[in-house]
Amino acid sequence: MENVNFTPKEILQKQFRQKMRGYDPDDVDSFLDNVIKDYDAFVKENQRLQDENERLLAKVDELTRQVQVGASQPRAAATSPASSNVTNMDILKRLSNLERHVFGSQLDNDPNESHRL
């Protein structure tokens, strides 16, 4: 808080000179008590927000590093889909053979009914 003129303690300890037709000291003290409470609340809120900002910046840095590390590592996942594609191809071939076996025998039994498939 670089642009702050007073600390809560300075506001609390401020003494005003009394003049003949001056302000009521009790009124001034009461008002300053309220000002100090507000000021103190603003200082705490400002500190909380600064702490949260630092925490979030640190998290952004951490996530950025994780992304950079992930981008620089060889893609193990890129080889994995290839093996799953082979597996998928095997499954598709088996399914095709099974369909030919099941539906092929039906087609052989009734050649006029083949259009229903």
Curated annotation (Swiss-Prot):
A Pfam cross-reference name: DivIVA
Compartment(s) where it occurs, according to its Swiss-Prot or TrEMBL record: Cytoplasm
CC per GO annotation: cytoplasm
Gene3D superfamilies for this protein: 6.10.250.660
Entry keyword annotation includes Membrane: no
GO biological process: cell division; regulation of cell shape
Major site of localization recorded for this protein: cytoplasm
The entry's keywords: Cell cycle, Cell division, Cell shape, Coiled coil, Cytoplasm
Residue ranges of coiled coil: 32-70
Listed InterPro entries: Cell_cycle_GpsB, DivIVA_domain, DivIVA_fam
Highest taxon, organism lineage: Bacteria
Keyword Transmembrane helix attributed: no
PANTHER family listed in its UniProt record: CELL CYCLE PROTEIN GPSB (PTHR35794:SF1), CELL DIVISION PROTEIN DIVIVA (PTHR35794)
Entries under HAMAP family matching the protein: GpsB
Family assignment from sequence similarity: Belongs to the GpsB family.
Subunit structure: Forms polymers through the coiled coil domains. Interacts with PBP1, MreC and EzrA.
Function: Divisome component that associates with the complex late in its assembly, after the Z-ring is formed, and is dependent on DivIC and PBP2B for its recruitment to the divisome. Together with EzrA, is a key component of the system that regulates PBP1 localization during cell cycle progression. Its main role could be the removal of PBP1 from the cell pole after pole maturation is completed. Also contributes to the recruitment of PBP1 to the division complex. Not essential for septum formation.
UniProt-recorded name of the protein: Cell cycle protein GpsB
Lineage of the organism: Bacteria, Bacillati, Bacillota, Bacilli, Lactobacillales
